[in-house]
């Protein structure tokens, strides 16, 4: 006869195995949808929206990649600022080369970005599961996967989904080691940060999550947590590698201030930023809302094919109520916010769950503030890396409300389904 404690352990083990299987299936489904979506976007000529450099990253599928990285070329530029994406693509194309008998190199490259996006979905599921019951984590993971920024950039060739996925992996890793710190966990977290900073140096803002979390939980005792300071050194190390080694390679040295180095790039873009009400409004609507849900079925406004620009959404939130589908989505989102405000109660799902909201908010705010100063016009490119933080800031208080469990699950399921359909219409055009 199995003892009660042994039976409980067996049940717990079965639960964890089932969770791993479910999360893997969701990630696999995301990969399939993203890869199929990439073909739909090509068919409707929709791969160059939101200032994406798809036309440039598509060259990563062609042979002799590093031989084509010549001085003052666009390939040299993306290698200088996003070397992880370039090296990842080069390695991937070598690995899948035997599959060119059935797929074109372009299709195989699209599969890479779809797989990277799916890995981010898998990471998001574990991030939600670290703070919420599995039924909520699963639904919020589907919402993350269906969000427009994640879906779109997983379906085209762009470095931004690599950064978003590394951000999700970082968040999931930290949330899971938060209550059980280990040296190996800290090393893994630092490795993710280093790779993320190599792909986009602004990923350094991820350090705000453990740093602010330590301050919130331990206040001045946090200064004794030496590992966070050592962990943060991954960012300047990555910058030194980018500026001192990669930029020092003659083939990638640039001269224009827009791309000569990271500092001149920041100053060049920031000097062109206009701080007006319209710019703030457009930035916030895109960063917070368009990144999650498409406000209209097409994004052809201000399109200019001569410069590989497929257009953006018309600035403004009123387009959400122009169709019954998006209007219903808005109504569900409003209901979710109303539940959070009206039925809120003390967050006690897991110990210290409420405390993580401040670090997540700190990361989301610093990333948004930087890109508002740096490049507000192209903010749709950079918002997917904040998607998980934004959704966690909604998921945690919503799970803690006094709304009945069945009603919570129903509302989230409807929201996930409508978001998938709404953004799916945009993908297929």
Model-predicted segments: where are they?
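Membrane-interface alpha helices of multi-pass inner-membrane proteins
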Residues: 184-201, 206-211, 233-234, 415
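Transmembrane-helix motifs of polytopic, lipid-linked glycan transferases
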Residues: 111-131, 169
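Transmembrane-helix signature of polytopic, membrane-embedded enzymes
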Residues: 124-146, 164
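Short hydrophobic/aromatic helix or loop-helix immediately within or flanking a transmembrane segment
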Residues: 71-102
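Specific aromatic-rich, kink-prone transmembrane helix
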Residues: 123, 150, 162-180, 185-193, ...
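Perimembrane helix-loop-helix junctions
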Residues: 2-5, 11, 176, 205-237
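Short acidic/glycine- and proline-prone juxtamembrane loop motifs at membrane-interface regions
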Residues: 155-160
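Membrane-lumen/periplasm interface segments of specific transmembrane helices
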Residues: 33, 37, 226-327
């Amino acid at each position: 006869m199995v003892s009660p404690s042994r039976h409980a352990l067996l049940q717990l083990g079965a639960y964890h195995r089932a969770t791993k299987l479910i999360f893997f299936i969701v990630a696999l489904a995301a990969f399939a949808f993203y890869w199929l979506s990439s073909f739909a976007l090509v068919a409707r000529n929709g791969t160059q929206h939101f200032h994406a450099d798809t036309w440039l990253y598509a060259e990563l599928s062609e042979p002799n990649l590093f031989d084509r990285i010549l001085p003052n070329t666009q390939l040299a530029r993306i290698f200088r600022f996003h070397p992880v994406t370039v090296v990842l693509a080069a390695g991937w194309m070598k690995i899948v080369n035997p599959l060119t008998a059935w797929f074109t190199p372009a299709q195989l490259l699209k599969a890479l970005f779809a797989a990277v996006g799916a890995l981010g979905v898998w990471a998001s599921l574990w991030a939600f599961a670290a703070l919420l019951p599995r039924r909520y984590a699963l639904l919020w993971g589907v919402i993350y996967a269906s969000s427009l920024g994640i879906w779109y950039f997983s379906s085209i060739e762009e470095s931004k989904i690599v950064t978003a996925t590394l951000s999700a992996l970082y968040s999931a890793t930290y949330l899971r080691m938060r209550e059980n710190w280990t040296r190996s966990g800290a090393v893994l977290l630092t490795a993710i940060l280093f790779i993320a900073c190599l792909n986009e140096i602004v990923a350094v803002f991820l350090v705000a999550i453990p740093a602010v979390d330590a301050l919130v939980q331990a206040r001045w005792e946090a200064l004794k947590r030496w590992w966070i300071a050592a962990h943060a050194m991954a960012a300047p190390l990555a910058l030194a590698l980018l500026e001192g080694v990669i930029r020092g390679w003659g083939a990638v040295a640039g001269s224009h201030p827009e791309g000569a180095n990271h500092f001149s790039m920041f100053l060049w873009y920031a000097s062109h930023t206009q701080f007006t009400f319209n710019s703030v409004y457009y930035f916030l609507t895109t960063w917070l809302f368009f990144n999650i849900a498409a406000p209209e079925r097409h994004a052809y406004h201000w399109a200019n094919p001569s410069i590989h620009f497929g257009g953006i959404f018309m600035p403004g939130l009123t387009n959400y109520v122009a169709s019954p589908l998006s209007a219903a989505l808005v109504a569900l989102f409003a209901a979710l916010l109303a539940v959070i405000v009206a039925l809120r109660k003390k967050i006690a799902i897991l110990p210290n769950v409420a405390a993580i909201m401040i670090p997540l908010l700190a990361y989301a705010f610093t990333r948004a503030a930087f890109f508002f100063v740096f490049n507000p016009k192209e903010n749709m490119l950079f918002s997917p890396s904040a998607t998980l933080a934004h959704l966690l800031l909604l998921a945690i208080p919503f799970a803690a409300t006094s709304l009945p469990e069945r009603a919570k699950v129903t509302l989230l399921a409807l929201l996930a389904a409508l978001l998938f359909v709404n953004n799916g219409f945009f993908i297929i055009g």
